[in-house]
């Protein structure tokens, strides 16, 4: 966790797959946010869009994720959105839960195969206008 210019916290979260694949310990949201000043805007970067309930409960302001590549391929794009295949809370887009905003981008690249169908590559610009 970093406090940037006394204006906002930037909180990086260990990738969830490192916990399952390599036995790494992933800190809980309550551990990561226990020392935050609630009056300062907080941003969590979490590679995979998982753990939304704990992130919203922690009171952070914004969570940004990627990982899903927007579904990457037809029919996965639709199947992931409808069924939650892959264990993600969201495949693409934005939503708000308990005053926490969540944004999942499809990113600019692919994974393992060198193309995408049914989703766009994108750079995401987020405008934050104070707390």
Regions from the language model: what does each represent?
Residues 1-131:
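Soluble catalytic domains of enzymes that build or remodel membrane lipids, polysaccharides, and related
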């Amino acid at each position: 966790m970093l406090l940037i210019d006394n204006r906002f916290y930037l909180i990086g979260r260990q990738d969830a797959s490192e916990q399952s694949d390599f036995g790494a310990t992933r800190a809980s949201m309550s551990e990561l946010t226990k020392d935050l000043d609630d009056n300062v805007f907080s941003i969590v970067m979490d590679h995979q869009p998982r753990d939304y309930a704990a992130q919203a409960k922690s009171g952070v302001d914004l969570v940004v994720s990627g990982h899903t590549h927007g579904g990457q391929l037809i029919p996965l794009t639709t199947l992931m959105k409808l069924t939650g295949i892959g264990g993600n809370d969201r495949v693409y887009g934005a939503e708000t839960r308990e005053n926490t905003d969540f944004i999942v981008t499809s990113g600019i690249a692919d994974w393992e195969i060198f193309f995408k169908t049914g989703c766009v590559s994108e750079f995401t610009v987020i405008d934050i206008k104070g707390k």
